[in-house]
Amino acid sequence: MPTDITIYHNPACGTSRNTLAMIRHAGIEPEIIEYVKNPPSRAVLADLIKQAGLTPRQVLREKEPIAAELGLAGADDDAILDAMMAHPILIQRPLVVSTLGVKLCRPSEEVFDLLPPDRRRPFTKEDGEVVAPRD
């Protein structure tokens, strides 16, 4: 089974770091896109959100101060995507893409669903919590 995985990663985020470590723990070296420095195009982001079965609002980091400054509380999807393009920190992370689908991996153990079944192993997160794949 192919193991191509891409993670839209922010190294400042513990959930993103744990997700990346879980992928590597499965013996897979993913393509890492530090999306704050190298954001995806608007079309790619919109497609990732759609493939994940989410809306732009569900991928918006609403607690970021810039979200309030921009008045995104009542914004439509297009305005949210525009804001994410201008301020990539507004994109919730990590988004992970594999041959098994696309997910916003919050919590990080959501990534188990995107790993080949024979590579899903229990993992100890940064805070010491042990997580395991669902049966």
Regions found by a protein language model. Give the residues of each.
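Thiol/selenol-based redox catalytic cores and closely related redox-interacting motifs
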Residues: 35-135
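A short alpha-helix capping/helix-coil boundary motif
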Residues: 1, 24-26, 42, 59-60
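Local sequence-structure signature of Cys/Sec-based thiol-disulfide redox active-site neighborhoods
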Residues: 2-26, 30-35
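Residue-level preference for short coil/turn positions at secondary-structure junctions
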Residues: 1-3, 91-92
